UniProtKB/Swiss-Prot annotation:
Residues 196-214 have a biased composition (Basic and acidic residues). Residues 212-662 are extracellular. Residues 468-559 form the Disintegrin domain. Its main location: membrane. Its cofactor is Zn(2+). It is an enzyme of class 3 (hydrolase). Binds 1 zinc ion per subunit. This is ADAM 17-like protease. It is found in: Membrane. It comes from Drosophila melanogaster. The active site is at E400. The lineage of its organism: Eukaryota, Metazoa, Ecdysozoa, Arthropoda, Hexapoda.
Length: 732
């Protein structure tokens, strides 16, 4: 009886332990998500439809229908296999402790893209393996994410998945209540002269200059950046669950979602210019370290056993790998937790011909090592020490690639760091973003301008041309006249045939699937609305012309129309409130007025709050950080950013701004400039005085009594022989 009681007590204790562990994991996930649901893979219905009797390698030959219910919504997904992000020479390898590579064979057909049934403006990116799904579902009003439960809830039932909305992702705060930095970035080295390719590059540049009297005439034809993805042993164990294929599939799915962000971006200098789009990524090689690397010769290795790494040191060690030269970019994925909650680091690209860092960079020599600075890294461990969710991983990786492509952090100006009421922060914001605000997955105008210059200058060196542009992907490419996607490949579209040609013999003038001003295969009547009004940019709604299938450029709003931040439209641009009053916009430097709208008479005048007082929206930059409910809250400075900015481009204005923003360090620096030389002089005289005193002490102990100052006086030593005295014995 006693033994039975002991057994029951033991089982109870074990049950309580695992229950507490599960609750702890749930609580950890609740720090990241406001709400989530768990469902089993058996709750998902899969249906596969074969398109024809003949086998075809066309990805649209097979349609997979997936249906399930979660988060109060029924999802019916229409999916097809796709390999957009896999290079034709794609290879994946598992690497052991001695560096031996083993080829890993992958099922490329487990990656899907598609749409939600009945939702015209929807898109889906998914990976399905043994019924367990990792996917992102984009709808006009919300984005849904699904991923395996084990990644965040180790004690959850096997074969279950976590579902959550993008709007339920929390923005993390650090101990001081500020939003932590997403990453740092590095500008390494100065201009390097690549003698071997100098003449070739000069000719290339000269030819391009002649071709680019208008810079918008040049559109890159090589649009894919080949990637090397490396997972260290920590990432393999934590995010891959100790399974090589799971790790590889996670990375492919991640890059697939990041590729969509880039591929849909129009790289332009100004909104009234066309720019170019379709720039993205393709994975050429994946390396997964299944165990820590054994060190040889005492050299540090990015995959060695080390509990704590400085993030910058880790990136530099990773950049020593010779194989990086064969790729556009190399990226390391780790599960290390870095100081300050940093989630990533990358070298910044530059449009200058021989600068190092970012895409298509020449090699760089530093401290006896050859570095390949087309690199970056991301961590899957946030500042809480928890694994990042899919949404966070997407944004962090996209952010680091943005640095590699040439963008620095968005400056604190309204154009590139708008408030939440104006769409929120953009992708390249210094601090982490939730991913829910409309701008969080977009590049700011500042980033667009920077990256565009780098792409035009360097993409031709190491990018590759798209290998699979095929009929049926809803994109009009090459000699296609239209592309109706899924319906078109079944020859069921009334405007576009299965060969992506317009059905002109049936009177088709355009395709409803590809042109906003096309309806029933005909140009829409003149005056039909095709684009909504944009008050933030002072653009009216656009209407079809009746003669073309494309939506024309939006006309400017009438002068005097109210636009963002109480401004007014003038000549098609939103003029800030202060300028409409004949004043200049500025930022009050008095804390009490820091979150009020302020103006000044001229550039050298003092800022003053307008009357009646106008409190700035939450998220607006202020003198020490960002406004929150009318109070200017201090945030952490991005020291790495400012430091490398100054080294890269030293000028008086930037130096003064740096000193002003870092007043404590400035005081220490200025004090040191004066104190160190003075200390050296004082120390010199102290030592001289000490030597003099030591000589005096030494003189006082001598017998010749010659003062040290009498150096010219000669001392003559006279040796006097002593007389020997003999003692005679008397003999009696």
């Amino acid at each position: 009886m006693f033994t039975k009681c002991i057994s029951c007590c033991g089982l109870a204790i074990i049950s309580v332990f695992f229950a507490c562990l599960f609750v702890e994991n749930c609580a950890a996930l609740q720090k990241t998500l406001r709400h989530y649901e768990i469902f089993h893979k058996d709750d998902v219905v899969h249906r596969v439809v074969k398109r024809g009797a003949k086998h075809s390698t066309n990805p649209f030959n097979t349609i997979k229908e997936v249906e399930f219910t979660t988060l109060g919504k029924n999802f019916r997904l229409i999916l097809h296999p796709h390999r957009d992000v896999l290079h034709s020479k794609f290879r994946a390898y598992a690497v052991d402790a001695d560096g031996n590579e083993t080829v890993v064979h992958m099922d490329h057909d487990s990656f899907y893209s598609g749409r939600v049934f009945g939702e015209l403006e929807s898109s889906v990116r998914a990976h399905i393996e043994d019924g367990t799904m990792t996917m992102s579902i984009h709808l006009p009003e919300e984005t849904y994410h699904i991923e395996p439960s084990w990644r965040h809830l180790p004690e959850a039932k096997k074969d279950t998945m976590v579902a959550y909305k993008a709007s339920d992702v929390k923005v993390h705060k650090n101990e001081a209540g500020a939003t932590p930095k997403t990453c740092g970035y590095i500008k390494e080295g100065l201009e390097l002269e690549d003698k071997e390719h100098g003449d070739t590059l000069d000719n290339e540049l000269h030819t391009r200059e002649k071709r680019q009297s208008d810079q918008y005439e040049y559109t890159p034809t090589k649009t894919r950046c080949p990637l090397l993805l490396v997972a260290d042993y920590r990432f393999f164990q934590e995010m891959g669950g100790g399974n090589t294929k799971t790790t590889i599939n996670y990375l492919i799915s991640l890059i697939d979602r990041v590729h969509k962000i880039y591929n849909d971006t129009v790289w332009q200098d100004r909104s009234d210019q066309e720019g170019f789009k379709g720039m993205g990524f393709v994975i050429k090689k994946i390396v997964v370290h299944s165990e820590p690397t054994r060190l040889r010769g005492g050299e540090a290795h990015y995959n060695m056993i080390r509990e704590k790494w400085d993030v910058r040191n880790l990136l530099e060690v990773f950049s020593r790998e010779y194989s990086h030269k064969d790729f556009c970019l190399a990226h390391l994925f780790t599960d290390l937790k870095f100081e300050g909650g940093i989630l990533g680091l990358a070298y910044v690209g530059s449009p200058r011909r021989n600068s190092v860092g970012g895409i298509c960079t020449p090699e760089y020599f530093k401290n006896g090592y050859t570095l390949y600075l087309n690199s970056g890294l991301s961590s899957s461990r946030n500042h809480y020490g928890q694994r990042v969710i899919t949404r966070e991983a997407d944004l962090v990786t996209a952010h680091e690639f943005g640095h590699n492509w040439g963008s620095e952090h968005d400056p604190d100006i309204p154009e590139c760091s708008p408030s939440a009421s104006q769409g929120g922060s953009f992708l390249m914001y210094t601090y982490s973003v939730s991913g829910y605000d409309v701008n969080n997955k977009k590049f700011s105008p500042c980033s667009l301008r920077s990256i565009r210059k780098v792409l035009q200058a360097k993409s031709g060196r190491c990018f590759s041309e798209p290998e699979e542009s095929f009929c049926g992907n809803l994109r009009v490419e090459g000699d296609e006249q239209c592309d109706a996607g899924l319906l078109g490949t079944e020859d069921n579209d009334s405007c576009c045939d299965k060969n992506c040609k317009l059905r002109r013999n049936q009177g088709a003038m355009c395709s409803d699937k590809n042109s906003p001003c096309c309806q029933n295969c005909q140009f829409m009547a003149s005056g039909m609305k095709c684009r909504e009004a944009q008050y933030a940019t002072c653009e009216q709604e656009a209407r079809c012309t009746g003669a073309h299938a494309e939506c024309p450029k939006s006309p400017a709003m009438a002068d005097g129309t109210t636009c963002q931040e109480r401004g007014q439209c003038r000549n098609g641009k939103c003029v800030p409130y202060c300028e409409t009053q004949g004043l200049q916009s500025c930022m009050c430097d008095i804390i009490a007025d820091a979150c009020k709208r302020c103006c000044r008479m001229s550039i050298n005048e003092t800022c003053f709050p307008v009357e009646p007082p106008d409190v700035l929206p939450d998220g607006t930059p202020c003198i020490t950080g960002f406004c929150n409910k009318g109070v200017c809250e201090k945030t952490i400075q991005d020291v790495v950013e400012r430091f490398w900015d100054i080294i890269e481009e030293i000028n008086v204005a930037k130096t003064l701004r740096f000193l002003k923003d870092n007043i404590v360090m400035a005081v220490v620096l200025v004090t040191a400039v004066f104190w160190i030389p003075i200390s050296c002089v004082i120390s010199y005289f102290d030592r001289k005085k000490l030597r003099h005193e030591m000589k005096l002490i030494e003189w006082s102990q001598k017998l010749d009594l010659i003062h040290p100052s009498d150096e010219r006086r000669r001392v003559i030593h006279i040796r006097v022989p002593r007389q020997k005295i003999s003692v005679a014995r008397a003999c009696n």
